[in-house]
Amino acid sequence: MDDKGSQRALLAQTVNEIVKLLIEAHNQKKDVNLNRLKCIVAQKNGLSFQPKLVDIIAGVPADYKDTLLPKLKAKPVRTASGIAVVAVMSKPHRCPHINFTGNICVYCPGGPDSDFEYSTQSYTGYEPTSMRAIRARYNPYLQTRGRLNQLMQLGHSVDKVEFIVMGGTFMSLPEDYRDFFIRNLHDALSGHTSASVEEAVAYSERSKMKCIGITIETRPDYCLPRHLNDMLLYGCTRLEIGVQSTYEDVARDTNRGHTVKSVCETFHMAKDTGYKVVIHMMPDLPNVGLERDKEQFLELFESPAFRPDGLKLYPTLVIRGTGLYELWKTGRYQSYPPSVLVDLIATILSLVPPWTRVYRVQRDIPMPLVSSGVEHGNLREHAMAKMKELGLKCRDVRTREVGIQEIHNKVRPEDVELIRRDYTANGGWETFISYEDPKQDILIGLLRLRKISDKAHRAELKGNVSVVRELHVYGSVVSVADRDPKKFQHQGYGSLLMEEAERIAREEHESDKIAVISGVGTRDYYRKLGYELDGPYMSKTLDASSAA
């Protein structure tokens, strides 16, 4: 037997031994350090490398898959929020505002004209999502199937999938390409080959793998009523809007190609269409300074003109080939020192209200490509440690989610209460309803309800209408057909939140109708609650009889 063959035989022997020891530990209710176990068994058997997690998962007998796979799951945080997120990228294309500003944003590293020529706009091509997209030659079907297979091999459930469409301004691409891209995302879940977006959505609705939502990255100038309407047809439920700064002078100096006033108008239109709105912000931009940075985040969370549902924080990075790189090289721009940046991020996180979710705290760009800027690969952890030191708390949605709390703090909720928070934002009345354990500050499920303003452009939402912009019960992904008493999805919290939303809409908003912006794969859930398809929404007429 050649060397490769003997190593394969040793690998099989090692995997069998590891699985046997894991089963013994499970039966004896003992905890095991898997990395240490892999190292010891591989060394004992003379294996020159440690077996991969995928190999161990494949070696688990069918009888033990249900009990061992949750313990073996790689990066459990990937599905801790109850959803398997699949990020996909559209083909490389030029930034749309080049036509009227003459250039891209000063800090933007990617795109077809950049040093990273096979990358999409604002990406280098070396981020994990970019590399998967390049391997698949930006084919949406191959990107989706590849990522789903990867997640399944690592022990994750892919019963509920949320797509994030990345790679620049997707809505600036030609309509036929956009239709092709979205059609293939839905077809990758259903296995059907569709001729149109409508057909793809119809099959996706009945698929075993449910598309519970699509998130699209866009800009204020590509978030007009016609764009909002197209995205509804795709099954999009959340928008990520690149804003970067709330200061008009900074938007102008960094060559954003839009005004902050247009950002506020976009937020208003998007929320009146039912979308969840996530904002991208960049601390440490040129000509801002520490105090102005703190003030803009205070304004972001407190001013009714903004108040986003989610936030992605991308501290400014200096990358070769950008306008900012030239400013930095000639001494006209200097990044914050690492300790100052950590302090700033800690301050920002302490300002986040309990109805906002912080999705990211830094870019995925590999550190060797960064000339100046973030020096820590785990900036969020450093900021959280600083907050603990200063006695500050981060109360954003992600920090308080039950799934995240279980992973990081081994804490489970005990006394669960219905909690309500009301605020005004973007011309409408917002109500954030949640089931929480207030004593331990753990969040189990949430619902975002909005009384639509009179500026709504959709016919389905005109008049006295309330809209549910988000319903989410947290905890590890549970198959739609299963009920696991230790997990919080499918335990009835969702229907209780919907009942309360209907009561508020009927009695306080005095609405005649309640609509839900629903992911394609969750429409059946709302049908069971008495909702009917109403254009792209699921709607229900509210009257006195529905109060029973």
UniProtKB/Swiss-Prot annotation:
Keyword Translocase applies: no
Catalytic activity line of the entry: uridine(34) in tRNA + acetyl-CoA + S-adenosyl-L-methionine + H2O = 5-(carboxymethyl)uridine(34) in tRNA + 5'-deoxyadenosine + L-methionine + CoA + 2 H(+)
UniProt cofactor note: Binds 1 [4Fe-4S] cluster. The cluster is coordinated with 3 cysteines and an exchangeable S-adenosyl-L-methionine.
Record EC number: 2.3.1.311
One GO location term (cellular component): nucleus
Keywords, alphabetical: 4Fe-4S, Acyltransferase, Iron, Iron-sulfur, Metal-binding, RNA-binding, S-adenosyl-L-methionine, Transferase, tRNA processing, tRNA-binding
Pathway recorded for this protein: tRNA modification; 5-methoxycarbonylmethyl-2-thiouridine-tRNA biosynthesis
SUPFAM superfamilies, alphabetized: Acyl-CoA N-acyltransferases (Nat) (SSF55729), Radical SAM enzymes (SSF102114)
Cofactor: [4Fe-4S] cluster
Assembly behavior: Component of the elongator complex.
Homology family: Belongs to the ELP3 family.
Protein name (Swiss-Prot/TrEMBL): Elongator complex protein 3
Organism: Caenorhabditis briggsae
Gene, per the UniProt record: elpc-3
